Curated annotation (Swiss-Prot):
The gene is glgB. InterPro entries: A-amylase/branching_C, Branching_enzy, GlgB, GlgB_N, GlgB_N_E_set_prok, Glyco_hydro_13_cat_dom, Glyco_hydro_13_N, Glyco_hydro_b. Signal peptide: none annotated. This is 1,4-alpha-glucan branching enzyme GlgB. One of its GO terms (molecular function) is hydrolase activity, hydrolyzing O-glycosyl compounds. Its EC number is 2.4.1.18. Pfam families: Alpha-amylase, Alpha-amylase_C, CBM_48, GlgB_N. Monomer. Belongs to the glycosyl hydrolase 13 family. GlgB subfamily. Catalyzes the formation of the alpha-1,6-glucosidic linkages in glycogen by scission of a 1,4-alpha-linked oligosaccharide from growing alpha-1,4-glucan chains and the subsequent attachment of the oligosaccharide to the alpha-1,6 position. Coiled coil: none annotated. Keywords: Carbohydrate metabolism, Glycogen biosynthesis, Glycogen metabolism, Glycosyltransferase, Transferase. Pathway: Glycan biosynthesis; glycogen biosynthesis.
Amino acid sequence: MNSQLSLSTIQSLVDGSVANPGSLLGRHPVNYRGREATSVRVLEPNAESVWLIDSASGLRRPMRRLHPGGFFEAICDEPITKPSTSRLQMIDKTGKEIKTTSPYTVPSIFSDLDRYLIGEGRHNQLYERLGAQLREVDGVKGVNFAVWAPNARSVQVVGDFNGWDGRGHVAQPVESTGIWELFLPGATVGQKYKFRIQTQHGHWMDKCDPMAFAAELPPLTANIITDINTYSWNDSDWLQQRAEMDPMHTPMNVYEVHLGSWQKGPGRTHGWLDYRDLAKRLVDYCHRMNFTHVELMPISEHPFTGSWGYQSVGYYAPTSRHGSPEDFMFFVDHMHQNGIGVLIDWVPAHFPKDDHGLRQFDGSALYEHADPRQGEHPDWGTMIFNFGRNEVKNFLIANALFWLDKYHIDGLRVDAVASMLYLDYSREDGEWIPNRYGGRENLESIDFLRDFNIAVHENHPGVITAAEESTAWPGVSRPTYDGGLGFTYKWNMGWMNDTLSYMRNEPIHRKFHQNELTFSLIYAFTENFTLPLSHDEVVHGKGSLISQMPGDMWQKFANLRLLYSYMWTHPGKKLLFMGGEIAQWTEWNADDGPQWELLDFDTHRGVQQLVADLNKVVIENPALHWHDFTGDGFEWIDAHNAEDSVLVYLRKGAEGDPPILVCNNFTPVPRDNYRVGVPAQGFWKEIFNSDGEAYGGSNLGNYPGCQTTGIEHHARPDSIEVTLPPLGTTILRLES
């Protein structure tokens, strides 16, 4: 029997250079000996012999090898009138018998609706179509592989299932999508794979699956077929409470954590703990410290450990450094069952240049801009996403929803938003391209951020989004319908910079810089601010927070306690990076982590206890969290005593909540009988004193509290006399 395909066509199939092998392989109508028949063709380079088996009748028909490269064909007398029920039985070159089916007889996983939504860039469940999807077709189990590579000449699927020889597993194009697809019978969970892509110039390259759910431990780069739908969640109560939560009026004390260095384990690779161990340890620690949430530095797969996760190639895969996807699900689940929220850093601003990643994915500038003035980031040596392309926006927004849907994440903190908003960010004249109106605003990125926030808030009520945005861009945390970007919170970088600048001054000079503290209240309610003391403030030569404090040893600790006390009583949600709560001396090193051994010393244990107590005070007192974002919750009592470097203010909650009086003394000079005006008469109980002995202070304060004296002061009808501890904060609450 001679095939109706030419030898040159068969040779092209064997070489893997046919762009649409489904048009030649599988079942096709032919005219055989003057009548209609069906040709069944397969390409199995590793097969010695192949039989075609009818599933209904069990009829076994041998297929003829027509090319030594593994091209087999059988002619069936009956024409194609219904879907195939035939199977393949083959003996491979090792003598092993394998039962399978032809990849090219299986219908596409993509429906008309899928193709439409992908074309529009609005397929929110893209992760249920692209990548490696477990699938069963007519009783045959396998994996459906699909990848977006519109400018590729050909795409092969290679992996453990075919000895990394993709010639017999060439993907087929999905009409009008730029997607290539192939169902591989017998492929199964745990096998490694990649996509082998041929560019328009004929060059072959192996690429990671952008939608892969798991990957090998770096520096290895293959993806792993994974079923992410088997974990049994136990956090339904948490999710229901989250959906009903109002993030505007909820206490939020966030502990920022780098999982790779928070704690180490002996005998582990680089000391990395697994997700399950980390979950149990972090729950215990957060409970002890009264943190309400953890914020994880990026956990998506990244090749370079030194990037801390901010240069990802596996946006849909939790890093294998700490275990499997199911292990990370356990991490989130365990945190939720114990009342701790989980936020993650998410990096849609840029991606690395690693050859196996997204850059030049199909031989063209696919995910990035072709022009380096738009497509390369000068600071980080990374690529910038092309936010004007529907498919790229879809990839990123679906990724955000993926973490919320599949991993129950409670919030996304978007990294480097400022770099996304401005076309000239960190660029000189001539190094950037203006927008269509001649301006510097990145209009496509702005639309993307708005669409991202709309998608998150519409699909997952109660989930928060936070922007690390360091400019004066207006309306970052305002609703999109009001012209804003739609974030829940914005990091208050101005507060952070001004406050640390002030605290670095010797106390004797602080009277000349009081405006650095008071200025933040001029704009404090223009956005929904989070006050961050993040990892960025303790790296790259800046030193640790306590090392940035002036003075002798006692003053350094007192200044740090004062900094935290001022921060926790200032309007805004709170975020502290690990190590800050124990006053570690060295700046953060991702290889070493916090200096836990310092807790052998009373002074460091004192700072740790202070942070735990501040968290508790914020949680238990609505006045310190209910109106974080409105001026109704803040009132200056004394902002003008620069000479003594004293700041006094009132925090207020909802109607009926007792007000909180905060007195800060930014000098080492204690001040007795310091008169402070108050809005109501009664007893003001001291509920916190940063100079407490338990924290390492001198125990100078106002315990148990102060009674009003009936004397007007600070334009208030009554007043109290307080003792202001040196470099200290005292917090008082009206009891009656």
